[in-house]
From Swiss-Prot:
Superkingdom of this protein's organism: Archaea
Gene3D superfamilies: Acetylglutamate kinase-like
Protein name as it appears in the record: Carbamate kinase
Keywords from the UniProt entry: ATP-binding, Cytoplasm, Kinase, Nucleotide-binding, Transferase
Species in which this protein is naturally found: Pyrococcus furiosus (strain ATCC 43587 / DSM 3638 / JCM 8422 / Vc1)
Compartments where located: Cytoplasm
Length: 314
């Protein structure tokens, strides 16, 4: 078999900037993404897929908000919304990819695994929630909801108030062994969507927690668990850059992991955007991976061939 690659799809694989997130818009984006992935599979790579879910979970939380306000339907907790989004997005990707493979005469099995991601209940992130989720509220509404629901709310960049939740570090996946066995049997697996549903182990039981896990860091854990050769993060820029957005901007094409770690520790990459992608790439190479890639979604095939994107090497 060819090299095994874990592909982490960014939000633009589902919803482009300026789009509202209708089913038709999303399906059109997913079909374009499926064509890229099918081409990678046609070239002999073994593929495992993970994806983001930010806008979709935000949408589900709004749906629940409206359902509760209008019809008195109880809202579900965040971990359930995460699981719902994995089913929703996984369904779209697996259907589009199966159809695209069939067009090429390739009969491959494609499945989505609702994945639970283990976090440490003592992770300091639980004491300092920072990840904004769901809709914006005015200050009065936000503080009322905080009292009623026990939420922590913070003002978000002058745009209004939002709920914030912890973003703990992923330690592994409950379903890791199952995913690995499927991959070894030639199944294309979609897993750890949106970073997976965050869970803790308490008194021998698995228990969901209200948190959000970074999908690239969780994707890196997935890459370790399936013994991937390559970990490829696809996003809406051409790779990682030093001094991004300034006159001194310098794109990184090929970089050794120790050099990239130095840039990371110097604070070159923003915490909410490129930072976790770079950290995930570093972790994968330090674990023993052959190559990590950060590249534009539309250039996935070229990036895998080393022609574009940021290529991170041992």
């Amino acid at each position: 078999m060819g090299k095994r690659v874990v592909i982490a799809l960014g939000g633009n694989a589902l919803q482009q900037r300026g789009q509202k997130g209708s089913y038709e818009e999303m399906m059109d984006n997913v079909r374009k993404t499926a064509r890229q992935i099918a081409e990678i599979i046609a070239r002999g790579y073994e593929v495992v897929i993970t994806h983001g879910n930010g806008p979709q979970v935000g949408s589900l939380l709004l749906h629940m908000d409206a359902g509760q306000a209008t019809y008195g339907i109880p809202a579900q907790p965040m971990d359930v919304a995460g699981a719902m989004s994995q089913g929703w997005i996984g369904y779209m990707i697996q259907q589009a990819l199966k159809n695209e493979l069939r067009k090429r005469g390739m009969e491959k099995k494609v499945v989505t695994i609702i994945t639970q991601t283990i976090v440490d209940k003592n992770d300091p992130a639980f004491q300092n929630p920072t990840k904004p989720v769901g809709p914006f509220y005015d200050e009065e509404t936000a503080k009322r909801l905080a009292r009623e629901k026990g939420w922590i709310v913070k003002e978000d960049s002058g745009r209004g108030w939002r709920r914030v939740v912890p973003s703990p570090d992923p330690k592994g996946h409950v379903e890791a062994e199952t995913i690995k066995k499927l991959v070894e049997r030639g199944v294309i697996v979609i897993a750890s969507g949106g970073g997976g549903v965050p869970v803790i182990l308490e008194d021998g039981e698995i228990k969901g927690v209200e948190a959000v896990i970074d999908k690239d860091l969780a994707g890196e854990k997935l890459a370790e668990e399936v013994n991937a050769d390559i970990f490829m993060i696809l996003t809406d820029v051409n790779g990682a850059a030093l001094y991004y957005g300034t006159e001194k901007e310098q794109w990184l094409r090929e970089v050794k992991v120790e050099e990239l770690r130095k840039y990371y520790e110097e604070g070159h990459f923003k915490a909410g955007s490129m930072g976790p992608k770079v950290l995930a790439a570093i972790r994968f190479i330090e674990w023993g991976g052959e190559r990590a890639i950060i590249a534009h979604l539309e250039k996935a095939v070229e990036a895998l061939e080393g022609k574009t994107g940021t290529q991170v090497l041992p």
